[in-house]
UniProtKB/Swiss-Prot annotation:
Keywords: Cytoplasm, Hydrolase. The gene is ureB. Pfam families: Urease_beta (PF00699). It is an enzyme of class 3 (hydrolase). It comes from the Bacteria. It comes from Acinetobacter baumannii (strain ATCC 17978 / DSM 105126 / CIP 53.77 / LMG 1025 / NCDC KC755 / 5377). This is Urease subunit beta.
Length: 106
């Protein structure tokens, strides 16, 4: 191995295998582009984005880490979301949750 070398498998790397996903149509009703990052809690995304917010609570974009999707003004598009994992606690973002997503978890 050469220092700094990255050895990858010969097959494609699959992201979020076995995790719950859903597709949702999102429209940008604003007059400016809106960009949402890969790990942003989609429920708390910019209010100019129109979609069923309650349906996406606890989900983020199902895209590679460090990437984003840009919604142009007037644009409507379907995106795939993936359920948040781990402790399923959300803090920060727009401050709409600030705690556990699942009430029945101790």
């Amino acid at each position: 191995m050469i220092p700094g070398e990255v050895i990858t498998p010969e097959t494609d790397i699959e992201l979020n295998v076995g995790r719950e996903t859903l597709k949702v149509v999102v429209a940008n009703l604003g007059d400016r582009p809106i960009q949402v990052g890969s790990h942003f809690h989609f429920y708390e995304a910019n209010d100019a984005l129109q979609f069923d917010r309650e349906a996406v609570k606890g989900f983020r974009l199902n895209i590679a880490a460090g990437t984003a999707i840009r919604f142009e003004p007037g644009q409507s598009r379907e995106v795939e979301l993936v359920a948040l994992a781990g402790k399923r606690e959300v803090y920060g973002f727009a401050g709409r949750v600030m705690g556990r997503l699942d009430e029945n978890v101790d």
